[in-house]
Regions:
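N-terminal ligand-binding/catalytic initiation module
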Residues: 2-167
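Short, ordered loop/turn segments at secondary-structure junctions
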Residues: 81-83, 91, 120-121, 146-149, ...
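Glycine-rich phosphate/diphosphate-binding loop of Rossmann-like nucleotide-binding domains
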Residues: 86, 93-111, 169, 173, ...
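General beta-strand structural signal in soluble alpha/beta enzymes
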Residues: 117, 143-146, 167-170, 201, ...
Length: 328
């Protein structure tokens, strides 16, 4: 969704409410609060100098004690450079901060995990790796978020090998887990076998490729998967340079457009951009199609549009204001 896109009355109301929510009564959505009493001189002497020296010395002698004497064990960094924010694109690190704060809210509310959101003004993958790896003493885990493909695959792989704390790439692992669960449940509802379905995909970034890798592991046949990037179907006759992740899903096919790929498909997986799946495309899908339109905040097709075109479809989006929310 671009900032100059014409909004419906409902979207204008949502925009105004969201902006007000983020601005008042305090700016932003997260804060840092002490977990120990600070009510008198003794508390202050224990929290800082001179008492703080003793846990410092203990950790110097035995680094594992950092998990006893500091918040490290329950502290995760949500880290981005803002190059691939789902549904918004390359909006940069500063504009992505509300998304990272929002993810921090979810960690705290639903898992009790504390979060620092870290937005980095750096696009070079190797420099990002150095910066993030240097944060290891502070953190109990890393959650990579909204970093564009194919760099994100390299960054996650290098950090996982280098760091001694968990490194989770949300757009790969989180989206893959939840969308695969939706696929299994959706196919069960319509009585289709996973090894027989045709899957059309819009998007070939980190989220889409990770979803496909898991779905193939669950039984989707690779020859039944048709992936589209910004240039159309990823087919064997493409002359442009494809990264390794896209090459795995090249098809020997005459299909060239998303409309071609969607024709006769049992499942649509969208990890791309608003409005790319049209009602006319949905009409050409197989009986009881499953539509996973996961672009946020605006899906590849609105549920009401999909349902009007195909009343027999099951549609899920990444939005919380529609039924069947499927996102990471």
């Amino acid at each position: 969704m671009s900032s100059d896109q014409k909004l419906s009355t409902a979207e204008q109301a949502l925009r105004d409410a969201a902006n007000e929510y983020h601005r008042l009564p305090t700016r932003g959505k997260i804060s840092v609060s002490p977990t120990k009493p600070l009510s008198n001189q003794r508390d202050l002497a224990l929290a800082y100098s001179p008492g703080v020296a003793y846990p410092c010395l203990a950790i110097e002698k035995d680094p594992s004690l950092a998990f006893d004497y500091t918040s490290r064990g329950n502290l995760v960094a949500v880290i981005t450079n803002g190059t691939a924010v789902l549904g918004l694109g390359d909006i940069g690190p500063l504009a992505s901060k509300p998304v990272m704060e929002g993810k921090g809210c979810l960690f705290k509310k639903f898992a009790g995990v504390d979060v620092f959101d870290i937005e980095l003004a750096e696009r070079d993958p190797d420099k990002l790796i150095e910066i993030i790896a240097a944060l290891e003493p502070t953190l109990g885990g890393i959650n990579l978020e909204d970093i564009k493909a194919p760099e994100c695959f390299y960054i996650e792989k290098q950090l996982s090998a280098r760091m001694n704390i968990p490194v989770f790439h949300d757009d790969q692992h989180g989206t893959a887990i939840i969308s695969s669960a939706a696929l299994l449940n959706g196919l069960e509802l319509v009585g289709k076998k996973i090894e027989e379905v045709k899957l059309a995909v819009s998007g070939a970034g980190a989220a889409a490729i990770a979803c496909l890798d898991v779905m193939v592991g669950l039984g989707v046949k690779r020859e039944n998967i048709f992936v589209c990037d910004s240039k159309g179907v990823i087919h064997a006759d493409r002359t442009d340079k494809l990264d390794e992740s896209k090459q795995r899903y090249q098809q020997h096919t005459s299909a060239r457009t998303l409309a071609d790929a969607v024709h006769g498909a049992d499942v649509f997986l969208g990890c791309s951009a608003p409005g790319v799946l049209t009602a006319d495309m949905v009409k050409t899908m197989a009986a009881s199609p499953l539509i996973l339109a996961l672009a946020n905040p605006e899906p590849e097709i609105r549920p009401e549009v999909a349902k009007a075109a195909r009343p027999d479809c099951i549609i899920a989006t990444g939005r919380s204001d529609y039924p069947n929310q499927v996102n990471n």
